[in-house]
């Protein structure tokens, strides 16, 4: 069931959010992230990392896989930061990769997903991150990648402190990915066929009027 969480001190609220957890090998986090993005296919997402180096790495990986992704960290020059923020304001950026500090104060309307590439060092930051999605009665999804017993214990402490029911899931398999891709290709082809039929119908109607 969706969790109802609020952190009123900073006006952060999570109205209805699913909290999903994926256990992944630490050295394959980026591959796991790409796999999840393929299956979840969010319209927009913030991907949180703990360090500026990880923000840059994840952003580059996503771009190389063809995703519309950009980064936001303290290392960015002011003009680059403004460029990224402008894309966010205009709704022209699909995936924003950011640190907690750089992402503070950024509001993306109708954000469906928050993805935590790694658990935050401060447990309270989890609620701040997850609070970016599931607003105004909408259902949001907060995904967290964890690796090893240390992460698992940290997650348990977050669950206990904030009363969050995490749902642990297995990563999508190759078969899952193939099924998702096939479904999207089929939907695309059907949409194009409907569009073609609609155009042909309109042409027939016009020619009939000329006869």
Which residue ranges define each predicted feature?
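Conserved helicase RecA-like core
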Residues: 1-209
